[in-house]
Design a protein with these regions (language model features):
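ATP/NTP phosphate-donor binding region
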Residues: 1-63, 73, 110-117
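Internal helical hairpin/lid segments
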Residues: 199-227
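Catalytic core of DAGKc-family lipid kinases
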Residues: 33, 81-85, 91-199
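Short glycine-/acidic-enriched loop or helix-start segments at secondary-structure transitions
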Residues: 74-76, 98-99, 212-213
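Short beta->alpha linker loops
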Residues: 43-47, 67-70, 92, 148
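Glycine-rich beta-strand-to-loop/alpha-helix junction loops that act as flexible
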Residues: 12, 66-68, 89-92, 205
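Short Gly/Thr/Asp-enriched flexible loops that form oxyanion-binding sites at enzyme active sites
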Residues: 71-84
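ATP/nucleoside-binding phosphotransfer catalytic cores, i.e., glycine-rich phosphate-binding loops
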Residues: 19, 189-190, 195, 215, ...
Length: 227
């Protein structure tokens, strides 16, 4: 029997640095279960994207994204382009995609044992992905696509590199509340155009965002629909 090959690509900074330790633990656990594992700890987001493209092009049994939703999003772009199986090892702050898929918030020996078994059995499940055309560029998403207040908060939080974890999002939210105004949106759904002002618009493949907020509670990542 051929030994399956799994590639772990981890964002070593995700989850306040926890993703690095989780990835090392995953490598050890999967290797002990008879999986040939290659671990990458890229130093930057651009390096992560380059490694993702290279790893997915080699068509291993699975490419495992270890980190938060941003890490999963970046690796997804490469995996879906060449139809490579993508797995998720939760290691970020929010882990909303993993949460929407029913994965545990904290990894354990049992989690890695089940993962190794799935890799050996070549077991995977098909899930939905959203395709977005942005300035002529095609982008894929597994979670919630949104615009408005939440996006403004996220953009502000990303600029607060001096703050860590969820605290910076709380600070960004309070700062954005002071100056945010509603915007006019035109949305076409099933051929019907809607125009209105809104604080935010969210389109969900998965139901969670923002670290567990159920913005689209009826969303199902396997029903072929966006909510």
């Amino acid at each position: 029997m051929t030994t399956p090959h799994a590639v772990i690509i981890a964002n070593p900074h995700a989850g306040g640095g926890r993703a690095r330790n989780i990835a090392v633990k995953a490598q050890s656990a999967l290797a002990s279960a008879g999986v040939n594992v290659t671990l990458h700890l890229p130093a930057s987001r651009e390096q992560l994207r380059v490694i993702s493209r290279q790893a997915c092009a080699e068509q291993p049994a699975v490419v495992l994204a270890c980190g938060g939703d941003g890490t999963v999003h970046d690796i997804l772009q490469s995996a879906i382009a060449v139809n490579t199986t993508l797995g998720i090892i939760p290691g970020g702050t929010g882990n909303d995609i993993a949460r929407s898929l029913g994965l545990p918030r904290k990894t354990s020996d049992s989690f890695f044992h089940k993962m190794a078994k799935s890799i050996h059995n070549q077991h995977c499940e098909l899930i939905d992905a959203s395709k977005i055309l942005r300035d002529g560029e095609q982008v894929w998403s597994l979670g919630v696509i949104s615009t408005g207040f939440d996006s403004a908060v996220n953009e502000r939080a990303n600029r607060m590199s001096h703050l860590r974890g969820t605290f910076r999002y709380i600070v960004a939210l309070l700062a954005e509340l002071r100056e945010f105004q509603c915007h006019q949106y035109t949305v076409t759904i099933d051929g019907v155009q809607h125009r209105d002002s809104a604080v935010l618009i969210a389109v969900g493949n998965g139901g969670n965002y923002g670290g567990g907020m159920r913005i689209c509670p009826q969303a199902d990542m396997k029903d072929g629909l966006l909510d």
